[in-house]
Amino acid sequence: MNMAERAEATKSWSCEPLSGKTLEEIVQNAENAADLVAYIRKPEVDLDFRLKFIAEHEEFFNVQLSDRNSRIRTCHNLSDKGIRGDTVFVFVPGLAGNLEQFEPLLELVDSDQKAFLTLDLPGFGHSSEWSDYPMLKVVELIFVLVCDVLRKWSTAVPNNDNVNPFNGHKIVLVGHSMGCFLACHLYEQHMADTKAVQTLVLLTPPKAHIEQLSKDKHIIQWALYGVFKLPWLFDVYRNKFDQVKGLQSSGIKQYFYQQGDDVKLKYRKFWQFKNNISNKSRTIIGYLLGWETVDWVKFNGVLTQTDMKQKIIIFGAEKDPIAPIENLEFYKQTINKECLRKVIILPDCSHNLCFDRPELVCENFQREVIDNSKL
C-alpha cells in the first residue's frame, strides 16, 4: 500500500449494513425507540448491525477437543486460492467481545493484501456455549482452530493432521484486553515451538495480576460460582439497573471516550450496545471463574530464547478506565527490552479502541505492525 492509499484507508472508516439502510436511518431509528433494549433485540434489526464485509468472510468450524466439541464462528480472508503471502494476522477478542470488534483492522489488513483470521470466543457472538470456561481450555481451542483453518485453506500444506500447518507461515498474534492474556498463553504454551510467531500485539492489556481473580480468594470465588449457577442474579442488575440506560450504560461509557453527533460514532455505539445485551451473564462469570494469570517469568523466558526473534508491540488507550495505562508499567519493566519494540498510547481513546477511534488505531497499526511485518 503506497502513501496515498494508506492515507485514504486510515482517513475514514466505512461500513455496509446488510439491511441496506444508511447509517443515518439506523441511528435515527435507534434514537427514536421508546425502549432501546427491546428495539435492539428485534430480529428484523439484526441486519442493521451485520456488515457485508463480515458476512462475506464468515465461516463456521467444528472444533474437536478431548472433552468437548464446539461450533466456532470465524472471519477470515483465506480461500481456495491459498493464503495471501506468508503472514497471517490472528486476532483474539477479549471478555464479552467478539470478532466484530476488530472489523476496522480486518478491513485494513485485507486492503493491504494480507491474510487475517479471527473468531468469536466460545459462548460469545455466534459460537457455541460451554458448560464451563477454563482459560487454558479456551487457549487450546484457539490453537486447534488456527491449525484447522490453516490446514484447510493453505495450498502449500496438505490437509493432514501429521503435517505442521505453520510451515512457510509467519503469524502476527493480536489480542485485545483479556485476549492479550489468551494470546500470551497461546504463544507460551502452544506456538513458541512452532517458530511461526513473528509479532505479538497487545491492545489495551489488562492488569498483569488481578488479585480479585486469584484462586486463593475463596470468598470471591464462591461468590462468582454462585452467580455462575444463578446467572439471573447478575441479569437483574444488567437488565434493570444498567442496560436500561442505553448509551449511558457502563458497557458504553467505559468503552468509549469520544462524544458528539458523528453518525459513524453513534452507529458503533449502538453496535456495541447490541453486542453487550446479547452476552449472557453466565458466560461472562464463567470466564472470570476460569481466569488464569500468565506466568510472566516463564513467558519472558520463552521470549528470550536465543533462536526466537519475536517482537511485542503494546497499544494503550489514554482514557481507558478498564485497563488504565498505568498498568503498562509492569509490561515495560518485565518484558525483555529486545522484544518490546514499542508502547503506543492513543490519545482521547477508551477501551474499545477499534470502535472509539478506528482511524487513529488503523493509522498506527498500519505503520507499526503491518509495515514492519514486511521487514
UniProtKB/Swiss-Prot annotation:
Its EC number is 3.1.1.3. Serine hydrolase required for the maintenance of steady state level of non-polar and polar lipids of lipid droplets and thus plays a role in maintaining the lipids homeostasis. Exhibits both esterase and triacylglycerol lipase activity. Its main location: other. It is found in: Lipid droplet. It is an enzyme of class 3 (hydrolase). Transmembrane segments: none annotated. It comes from the Eukaryota. One of its GO terms (cellular component) is lipid droplet. Residues 88-358 form the AB hydrolase-1 domain. It comes from Saccharomyces cerevisiae (strain ATCC 204508 / S288c). Coiled coil: none annotated. Disruption phenotype: Leads to the appearance of giant lipid droplets and an excessive accumulation of non-polar lipids and phospholipids upon growth on medium containing oleic acid as a sole carbon source. The keyword Hydrolase applies. Belongs to the AB hydrolase superfamily. Lipase family. This is Lipid droplet hydrolase 1. The active site is at residue 177. The gene is LDH1. It catalyses: a triacylglycerol + H2O = a diacylglycerol + a fatty acid + H(+). GO terms for molecular function: hydrolase activity, acting on ester bonds; monoacylglycerol lipase activity; serine hydrolase activity; triacylglycerol lipase activity. Keywords: Hydrolase, Lipid degradation, Lipid droplet, Lipid metabolism. The keyword DNA damage does not apply. A motif (Microbody targeting signal) lies at residues 373-375. GO terms for biological process: acylglycerol catabolic process; lipid homeostasis.
